[in-house]
Amino acid sequence: MNRLTCALTCLALGFTISTRADDKDATGKHLFILSGQSNMAGLRPEESFTPAVKKTFGPENVIVVKDAHGGQPIRRWYKNWKPAEGTEPKATGDLYDRLMTAVKAATKDQEVQSVTFVWMQGERDAREKHGAVYQASLEGLLGQLAGDLGRKDIHCVIGRLSDFDLENKRYPHWTIIRKAQFDFVE
C-alpha cells in the first residue's frame, strides 16, 4: 500500500504543482478528492498523501476528502450509467451523492484554486463484464463532478488496475478496463 500511496501522491502533485507554477498569485485551497473501491478504501491518506500535499502547498492550503467503498461498480458513482446491453440497474449514483456531501461540507465557505480527482476503481466492472462502457462511464463521472463543482479544470489521476489477470481468467474484462483507464487519461 505504501508504494501505491507514493505513486498516487507523485501523480497528484505533478498535476497541481504545474497549476501552482502557472499562477503564482492565485489564492484558494487545493482540493483533492479521493474515491473508488477497495484499494482506495484501504488507503490512509493521513499517513503519506496528505502530509506530502500539505508540504507542497502549505497545511492551510489543502483540503483532502476521501470517500471510498470496496467492491463497488462505477455505476454507484456515475448517475447516468448504462450497460452495453441488458436491463439497467435500479440504483446509480448513491456513492457519488455520499462523496459530494463530504466534498461540500469540506469546502463550505472555502475558495478552491484547484481540484484533483484521484480515482481507484474497476475490478467490479471487470468481473461484471462492463468493459465496453467503462471509458464512457469515467468520462461521464468526471463531467458529472465538473458540473457539480462548477469547474472545467479538474485534474484527474487514475489508479490503473494491476497486471495480475492479463489473461482475463478471473475477471473477464480485466484488460478491457485497463485499456479504458489508459485511454481515458491519454
What do the predicted segments below correspond to?
Residues 6-16:
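Bacterial N-terminal signal peptides
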Residues 1-4:
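Positively charged n-region of N-terminal signal peptides that target proteins for export
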Residues 21-186:
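Cell-envelope and extracellular/periplasmic
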